């Protein structure tokens, strides 16, 4: 049919003279290309956590993990120069959550779990590594930050209060030892 100004009508009327074909259930229906990528994004108020949970750590978080758990952050309440002071300072620099009153270094993993943090024995960049008192031969334990996970599984950490020196200092931990420690992710 002809529409306005002699152009073909974009919405022609149905042609009642044409033969119709009945629909069957054995056909296929193709909507074109299938979408690729993730269709569900996990929300997190902290943009760094949101990027990690939907990127690097996708499908690795524990069942029921709430990325918006209480952080316990009320500012750096740790004594200057202590390992806990550095861990708090560095996590804040990285934009990752950290509690203000997690206790001595050796207490951090349990304190963080109690607040809802994801804690396990697999290191990831930006994590707090927790050394128990027995692992460092003192009554307080120790904490540091995982700065890099190397291809061979070893890690590089930054830490403070090593041999009474403020720091921060860097050192490596061999791959065979990394799973002996607890790591606070976020």
Please state what every model-predicted region is.
Residues 62-186:
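Peptidoglycan cell-wall recognition and remodeling modules
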Residues 1-93, 173-186:
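Intrinsically disordered, low-complexity
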């Amino acid at each position: 049919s002809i529409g306005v100004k002699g152009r073909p009508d974009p919405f022609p009327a149905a042609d009642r003279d044409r033969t119709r074909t009945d629909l069957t259930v054995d056909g296929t229906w193709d909507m074109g290309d299938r979408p690729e990528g993730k269709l569900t994004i996990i929300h997190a108020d902290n943009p760094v956590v949101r990027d990690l949970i939907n990127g690097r750590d996708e499908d690795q978080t524990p069942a029921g993990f709430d990325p918006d758990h209480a952080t316990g952050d009320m500012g750096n309440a740790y004594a200057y120069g202590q390992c806990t002071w550095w861990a708090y300072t560095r996590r804040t620099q990285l934009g990752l959550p950290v509690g203000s009153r997690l206790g001595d270094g050796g207490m951090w993993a349990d304190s963080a779990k109690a607040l809802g943090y994801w804690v396990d024995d697999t290191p990831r960049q930006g994590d707090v590594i927790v050394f128990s008192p027995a692992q460092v031969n003192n009554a307080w334990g120790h904490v540091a930050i995982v700065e890099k996970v190397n291809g061979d599984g070893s890690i590089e950490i930054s830490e403070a209060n090593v041999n009474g020196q403020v720091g921060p200092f860097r050192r490596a931990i061999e791959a065979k030892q990394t799973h002996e420690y607890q790591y606070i992710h976020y």
